Amino acid sequence: MPGRTSQQIVKSEFWRLGISDSYLCVDSDCVFIRPFTQSDFIAPEGHPFTIVHEAKELLQFAIRNGMEKVSNDYHKERQEIMKIFDRSGHHYDFGPPPLLWSRHVWAALDEQYLKPRNMNFYDAIVLFSGEIQWYGEAMLKYRPFPLIPVEPFFKFYFYERQFLIGKQQGETIEGLARDYLGVCYQSNWDTKSNLVQKPLLSRLVRWIRRVIFRRYT
């Protein structure tokens, strides 16, 4: 089983342990930049917030930087999962990490979608590889508790260019901490863009530049 598939299954099946009703999945690339409390994640009524937005910041970045594939893939993937749930309308994103999930949403997906089709979560991932979208669309479909929308908890840099432009425009940890709980620097920046692979020397220079920028974050 591919590592990415097994990782999706482990994160999404954690709820079965019965340890908690809600849990936060934090990637190793994520760093908290200010203190946080339960109220950052759980509404006064006791329900977890739901990350839901339309990824307009990312899509605009892709347009400005000639990354048409990013935009095309985003909309194509949402259309695929929306078709599974027989939903039309806006193309929502329910991430990026860290992800706040509820056992009640996963249980609803299991009881109302997977079991009636004699499926498990591995089958779901084979059908559509994206646990974040499975969770979000299940939340929209089954509503086991009121949906209280929030923006992502962390400033997420999908691409190195985003990080560098942010630095050039004066982004600081202190400034980001006013709106975000943390930041996430992708460890696979070099493999995510649809640009041609650059020569080794160019990549080495970029790595050195990245280290220098990180030193002052």
Annotate the PLM regions.
Residues 31-67:
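Conserved donor-nucleotide/metal-binding helix-loop-beta segment in metal-dependent transferases, i.e.
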Residues 29-33, 37-39, 55-57, 140-142, ...:
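Short, solvent-exposed loop/turn segments at secondary-structure junctions
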Residues 79-171:
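Catalytic core and acceptor-binding pocket of nucleotide-sugar-dependent glycosyltransferases
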Residues 6, 26-28, 150:
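Short His-Asn-centered micro-motif
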Residues 80, 86-88, 178-217:
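Membrane-proximal basic amphipathic "stem/tether" segments
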Residues 1-17:
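Active-site-proximal specificity loops/subdomain of glycosyltransferases
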Residues 23:
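Short aromatic/hydrophobic "clamp" motif used to bind/position activated sugar donors
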